[in-house]
Amino acid sequence: MESPAFSKPLKDKINPWGPLIIMGILVRAGASVQRDSPHQVFNVTWKITNLMTGQTANATSLLGTMTDTFPKLYFDLCDLVGDNWDDPEPDIGDGCRSPGGRKRTRLYDFYVCPGHTVLTGCGGPREGYCGKWGCETTGQAYWKPSSSWDLISLKRGNTPKGQGPCFDSSVGSGSIQGATPGGRCNPLVLEFTDAGKRASWDAPKTWGLRLYRSTGADPVTLFSLTRQVLNVGPRVPIGPNPVITEQLPPSQPVQIMLPRPPRPPPSGAASMVPGAPPPSQQPGTGDRLLNLVEGAYQALNLTSPDKTQECWLCLVSGPPYYEGVAVLGTYSNHTSAPANCSVTSQHKLTLSEVTGQGLCIGAVPKTHQALCNTTQKTSDGSYYLASPAGTIWACSTGLTPCLSTTVLNLTTDYCVLVELWPKVTYHSPNYVYGQFGKKTKYKREPVSLTLALLLGGLTMGGIAAGVGTGTTALVATKQFEQLQAAIHTDLGALEKSVSALEKSLTSLSEVVLQNRRGLDLLFLKEGGLCAALKKECCFYADHTGVVRDSMAKLRERLNQRQKLFESGQGWFEGLFNRSPWFTTLISTIMGPLIVLLLILLFGPCILNRLVQFVKDRISVVQALVLTQQYHQLKSIDPEEVESRE
């Protein structure tokens, strides 16, 4: 992969294996150093400044990538001019000092000439870079000046009617209808051209603006356009090298102590303020590795309990340490950069192993179409696609939580939605026991199952898709989040270790170079140490700047992933993460509360049914008792009696 230029000039070299050591560290870290990710979100500020007065006419900030942060800039012509033009004329008056001058200013056309690329004969700042006709590239004039190569276009906005808007409402003219703050009645709109969106804005660029008058000299003002990108400066460590001190063995399990009832303070004793809790210590290497394996076991045990009756989970000690599983998911669409994607990071990590089939976006080449179950094309427009919680976009330019459709439409970049899993292998007990037994015959190499194959799709499928259908789904999702937190902690510790090694190597190289200079002085008569050793090439190439940049970028990306993970956590899940006693209390009283609620809901109905049933049975018994005590009289038909008579 492509690497940036060396951060320092070439120096004398005493150790030719230095670059190889640095490359080994980079491979160990699993990071590849390239140019900035095109999907990286920055805080970009565009500033328009009057070069004659130094005042800022407009300062607009927005979040976005370096490809689509080119907004329309709105400001007033009088913000560029100030109180007076450089050479006021009688028909212009005092420029923008008075309402009449502001009103007369908007009656004139204007034209703009670039100062960043001055054509022959266009003059300098005194002429506003408009020394002759044909130098103008944009403006608002009857001949419609335009250009195909300039970076901006500047036109008038919606110019208000009447003289009211030219009066300043803040200095006693508020009673005048239409008065505005500052009396701004010459609105301008600055837009970036296609050439401006492709240009480099590393330094300010200058233009000259002139009012067009039929007679006399055209007044001039100069302005600059600057792009400022918020960036995080380098972190400078203070203290001992933490590489060795961080290699701690696994900590012993903490014995749980039952809380004791508080004792009342003795009479007359002064009230004691409890001290602040001790700061939490960062886990050592042993704890981090055990957390990864323990998180893998908990997630596997809740999803496939039959596989964890007796098994061995082994953490792979060589790279790659992580692998990706392509998944299908529903991403969120944002018109502006989300807050969890606004962390300024300039690096990218790559995955050397991606399996499965999932959601792909962009122009996927034929060599990688096997990873795509569904391929979506991005539509026109500028918006951002944020990956669901627990997933990340694996692009041809690196890993990123957010995608910019502007970048996808302008480049050949493509991305796959993946889950990130640690490289943990699953082995049956027979395989592990066989490694320690004495065998004369060996079976063929067994197939190693990794955690990604066993749990792939846990975020977007299976359990996570069934959230709300039962407690098992919630618990399993919780275990998956614990595993993701362990992965994040391990990556952060890996970044810190490599950064400390890089600084140690830099210190060592400085000592070696000092020794080299001393040897050159000793062998000065022979032409220096290189000539005395009869070596043709004796230079030291410092590659530590590459490692330093890579680690700074890795640290910032981890912060970005942490914010994305926290933003994707629901309120119900966060409720149980606040304190352990709250979780225990809820799980203890949840059962009785549910039973009590069911009794209150269905108890009255069941009781009424029971009372009605008892009443019916009692009425039947009463009827039987009355029937036995009385005899029914025989009914006589009157017709039959008459017939007898």
Swiss-Prot record:
Cellular component GO terms, alphabetical: host cell plasma membrane; membrane; viral envelope; virion membrane
Segments in the Extracellular topological domain: 34-585
Region (Immunosuppression): 513-529
Keyword field contains Signal: yes
Side of membrane Cytoplasmic, spans: 607-640
Disulfide bridge positions per record: C113-C130, C122-C135, C311-C314, C311-C538, C341-C395, C360-C372, C402-C415, C530-C537
Lipid group attachment sites (S-palmitoyl cysteine): C605
Site description Cleavage, residues in chain: R444, E445, L624, V625
Cross-referenced PANTHER family: BC035947 PROTEIN-RELATED, VIRAL ENVELOPE PROTEIN
Protein name: Envelope glycoprotein
